[in-house]
Amino acid sequence: MCIGKIPRKAASPSPEPTRPGSTCFSASRLNGTTFQIVEDDKFLEMPIIYAKVYPSVFVLIDTGCGGAARDSSVELRSLRRFLETFPVKDNGEAPLNPGGEREYLVICTHCHYDHIMPGGIEQFVETEGSTVWASNYDKDYLSPTRLPSTSLCDKLNIKTPEYTITNWCRDGQQVVDNAGHGLGLTVYHTPGHTPDEVAIWDSCERVLFVGDSMYQYAPIFFFETQSVIRYSESVGKMRQLVRRFNAETDAADFLAEVDTFLYQIVTGQVKRKASSDMSGHPRDSYTRKDGGLEFQGNGEYFEEFKASKEAMDSIRKRQIVEQTTLGATDCSVVLPR
């Protein structure tokens, strides 16, 4: 999630006639069991939702902007209806979950609005047998009293979704269906972008879903309540996981790129640029020369990092290890953009 980072036309100011058969969602096959669904939304977030099809359950990693379409003329704006009725070319022209034949299991990578908006997640929690999984790292962060703020819904003046988390995930928890059968998915706490951020390791397809922890060619944001120190720790953690999983070059290399760029920032090798957030509050911006990586956040977060001997020693040590270690590989990281 990153507000306004996709330069596209704004939503149409007036309603247009509905175009039959049109939708704001598009789906393509990522691998043997996983589909990537992109939502063309009016907030210009273009959230990516991942759908994994199992014999016993239909897993969704995030639920997007709830059909808040950029194009007001599209007919189908319900994610659930799209999954249950819309023919997908990469699925033999069949819907991904025809008629809702499989129960839904939703994993929230974090609680920002473009991952949980009312028209999305609420469609699934109202169904008997559906479950919602989220991080137990900081339960209060996801409480109904704080969610309007932590989700950023209040900043955009949009309704905060109402849903119950049925499964609070501890770090390293295995995801199971309602019968207790393992799905080959493991949830890891990766706080930093938000306290509740998680990554999901798919051991069958050898893919690591990183949520909004990192992007290519789009800013990585640090808003209020977020921490560059915790983020750095999570990047280091994911690098260790990738090595343990005998991860593929694209996964290991990109994580190393993010880690190295952050190191260059906190050691003064990258020039700071002044910018502002959507409320007009000042923030610092750091962009790699090729534009492939960018960090934005309150300058205090970066200064806090520089002042922490433990944080600086840890990231410096990882750079030394990177210079002396090469890993064999056979898996990949899935990025949200």
Task: Give the predicted meaning of each segment.
Residues 1-17, 26-29, 106, 153:
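Short, basic/low-complexity N-terminal boundary segments at the transition from targeting/disordered tails
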Residues 8-9, 30-36, 152-158, 180-185:
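Short Pro/Gly-enriched beta-strand edge/turn motifs at strand-loop
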Residues 20-95, 200-212:
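Conserved beta-strand hairpin/beta-sheet module of binuclear metal-dependent hydrolase folds
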Residues 26-30, 52, 171-180, 286:
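Short acidic-hydrophobic surface loop/beta-edge motif
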Residues 58-60, 65-75, 180-279:
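Metallo-beta-lactamase
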Residues 67-181:
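Active-site HxH/HxHxD metal-binding segment of metal-dependent hydrolases
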